Amino acid sequence: MPNLEELWAYLNDKFREELTPVGYSTWIQTAKPVKLTKDKLEIEVPASLHKAYWEKNLVTKVVEGVYEFAQLEVDPVIMTKDELQPAPATDQRPAVEEDDQNLTFKAKTHLNPKYTFDRFVIGKGNQMAHAAALAVAEAPGTTYNPLFIYGGVGLGKTHLMQAIGNLVLDNNPAANIKYVTSENFANDFINSIQTKQQEQFRQEYRNVDLLLVDDIQFFGDKEATQEEFFHTFNTLYENMKQIVLTSDRLPNEIPKLQERLVSRFNKGLSVDVTPPDLETRIAILRNKADAEDLSIPDDTLSYIAGQIESNVRDLEGALVRVQAFSTMKNEDITTSLAADALKALKLDDRSGQLTIPQILNAVAKYFQLTVQDLKGKKRVKQIVIPRQIAMYLAREMTDNSLPKIGQEIGGKDHTTVIHAHEKIMASMTTDENLKAQVIELRNILKNRG
């Protein structure tokens, strides 16, 4: 059994890397581990909103992290401080047993039962992805195979993917479903080689009815893993078994992804999810508030929705901050109170986010050029290389899509951005001067302000 403190420190490090500073401080630093047994990890959180957020967004990552750290499969149980207080057994025991049943994962699949189509808020930015996911769930293996869902972090890709798994399982409880991240797949593959159990690994992944692989972009620099996944994909596809993949970008935009995998991924349907518009953000907040029995006026929800444009996770984090602020001050939630509660969040979320114009200004100043030079079409070396560096930095240091980067740097095509990124990456391995310039610019941008 692993040491609980060491395990929690490992999980904290993972969350610190994956979440925004605001998200980390809101969700992770306010939680603490209570007890670890051979099949359960109890985690205490401050309030019901935190609990709901953990159950929806974080428990999957806990399961993965515990397995990575200790090769132990556990079901996270998220409880508020009040729920952890001792009480008469006759009153509390049945409720706790019901909570355990409702909150834990379906052990066989690692699917979060809260990720369902009913709980998914549909908007302009995700309606096509939602429709495609529902079609796949209702008739797996017959249409849109594979289904490739792509987009930025916190926009609902994992929710849709797991909703497919949950609906398939509801319709057919005997279905063999495998949900993993690309990192899980790679780790399982490596372990199978080390333990000489490759055949067992292949049986586990190739005899499923539905394979769900999250964050497929991390296959990019893993040649042997790509080889293994190629054969796994072919076996499932030929047997008309459904494959669903998610990524932060299109298949042909994933660096170092084999062309034959790009071709396989493009066989089905690729659909994107984009940041929710204002109406959708308001609907998400109303849905969340109703689920938590929070009394919040419509104008206050509209105000909160207007402050957070990035993704659903940050949006829900903002609602939690407002609710906590209301509790602390013992005041009803109003627009004025929400504005006070979100002051720090607004500063972190907007001021701290690097933009493409900031990158262009820094690169232009560094190379003694103008921003217009970088956006222009001149092909002289003194401008081309800084322009490529700007594209490289925009790709590495922001969450903007390739088309967005190209558009803001003079209306270039997204393939130009890909070429620039690859060119600078390759040049940095042989040109020490260029490498030093890129590192210096990175530091300038990180320490801006």
Curated annotation (Swiss-Prot):
S-S pairs: none
GO cellular component: cytoplasm; plasma membrane
Region named Domain I, interacts with DnaA modulators: 1-72
Xref: InterPro entries: AAA+_ATPase, Chromosome_initiator_DnaA, Chromosome_initiator_DnaA-like, Chromosome_initiator_DnaA_CS, DnaA_C, DnaA_dom, DnaA_N_sf, P-loop_NTPase
Database matches in PANTHER family: CHROMOSOMAL REPLICATION INITIATOR PROTEIN DNAA
NCBIfam families, per the entry: DnaA
Subunit (UniProt): Oligomerizes as a right-handed, spiral filament on DNA at oriC.
The name this protein goes by in its record: Chromosomal replication initiator protein DnaA
Organism field: Lacticaseibacillus casei (strain BL23) (Lactobacillus casei)
